[in-house]
């Protein structure tokens, strides 16, 4: 049997990252070492609580570490401190506009808490004591990882690979030239790109080709499990919001 691939997820959990956590945890070929939260689509308290809610739905025991609440450098543009509200759209028959990323996922409040150690120190401690066999998978701003690299540059030699979602070649989602995860903390992105670590970038051009539709959402819901329902709820929310943004 092939050895499981050890990964640490770094997330700014909304509906998309919730599915990423569930997918990673349930993949038989992955050993989910931990999940670290960071400010991004929503401020840190929301992304952290959402991560804990997903863990509860999974009935999992992987540790969750709270990370950085702001970008590495002072605010240069509005909303770069996790105050980004995302796109909103008004849906006929509904009083309030729908946000792509709501503050809280529609899951029960978490009954558990994060680890006491900060995510940055967790990265340093874990990687420095590892055998170089851990892959980092950030799907939000790169603040936590970049900060750890600045504090202890030696961790770069211990990272097996960084597989990140960020950037775009022909697609953007924040400005005419920027994808959100890079835009939210470009200094952190520069540090990670210059780290010398093996890096694979999954840009918007790729993620926008990995579509999921209403039929697949219904199939998840038909599983009749808490996780199936949670995935379907996340997908249905995005379908509803995006269908009114087109």
Predicted feature residues:
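N-terminal acidic, glycine/proline-rich low-complexity segments
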Residues: 1-246
């Amino acid at each position: 049997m092939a050895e499981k691939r050890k990964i640490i997820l770094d997330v700014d959990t909304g509906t998309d990252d919730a599915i990423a956590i569930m997918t990673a945890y349930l993949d038989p070929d992955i050993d989910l070492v931990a999940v670290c939260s960071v400010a991004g689509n929503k401020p840190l308290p929301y992304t952290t609580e959402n991560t804990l809610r997903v863990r509860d739905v999974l009935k999992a025991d992987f540790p969750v570490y709270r990370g950085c609440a702001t970008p590495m450098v002072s605010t240069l543009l509005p909303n770069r401190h996790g105050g980004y509200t995302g796109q909103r759209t008004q849906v006929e028959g509904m009083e309030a506009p729908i946000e792509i990323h709501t503050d809280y996922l529609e899951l029960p409040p978490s009954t558990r808490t994060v680890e006491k150690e900060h995510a940055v120190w967790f990265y340093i401690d874990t990687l420095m004591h590892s055998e170089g066999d851990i892959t980092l998978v950030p799907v939000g701003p790169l603040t936590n990882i970049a900060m750890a690299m600045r504090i202890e540059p030696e961790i770069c030699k211990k990272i097996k690979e960084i597989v990140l979602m960020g950037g775009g070649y022909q697609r953007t989602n924040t400005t005419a030239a920027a994808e959100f995860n890079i835009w939210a903390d470009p200094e952190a992105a520069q540090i990670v790109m210059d780290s010398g670590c093996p890096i694979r970038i999954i840009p918007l051009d790729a993620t926008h080709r990995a579509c999921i539709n209403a039929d697949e959402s219904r199939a998840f819901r038909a599983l009749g499990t808490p996780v199936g329902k949670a995935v379907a709820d996340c997908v249905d929310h995005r379908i509803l919001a995006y269908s009114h943004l087109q």
